[in-house]
Amino acid sequence: MKIVKNGTGAWADSLQRGKYHQRRQELGGEKLKAGLWELAPGKKSFPLHAHQVTEEALYVLSGKAKVRTPEGTTELGPGDYLSFPAGGPAHQLVNDGKEPFRYLGLSAAFGHDLVEYPDSGKIAFVLGAYPTGKRFIFEKAKQADYFDGDPDA
């Protein structure tokens, strides 16, 4: 059992570049990961992405943001709950407001994942759980045939 008392965890910056910036307070878990997340005003979470193995969910604590999917955008506010099943539609959070957007993020982590990025045409194979796992990112357009490069094929 692990107990994290309110206000005792350390915040750490997540992946950042350009319009992408959020920070996270890891709460722990083995198969079910949990973390407090804060998305700064005018920023986006991660690029539009879809997990093929990991299921994610979030519960909005404060602030407002929009969730972007291939079907459009939906505004989110305190008390809203979202679930993103593995293999489900791509998603991204966008905070176009003036206040931080805070949420509890949950993920069923299995130590590996395949993640698609529709906007950039990339695909990532992830070994290990976020944030310490290794990522191998490729452009989908540069796919190779199964036997490419094999001298015996």
Residue spans of the language-model regions?
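Short hydrophobic/aromatic patches on the structural cores and recognition surfaces of FHA
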Residues: 63, 79, 93
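Ligand-binding loop in jelly-roll beta-barrel domains
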Residues: 86-113
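Short, conserved beta-strand element in jelly-roll/cupin
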Residues: 36-40, 50-68, 106-110
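A generic structural motif
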Residues: 45, 55, 62-64, 71, ...
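Short acidic-glycine-tyrosine-enriched beta hairpin
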Residues: 70-88
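Conserved short histidine dyad/triad with adjacent acidic residue
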Residues: 18-22, 35-51, 86
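A short, N-terminal "cap"/entry segment at the start of jelly-roll beta-barrel domains
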Residues: 1-31, 114-153
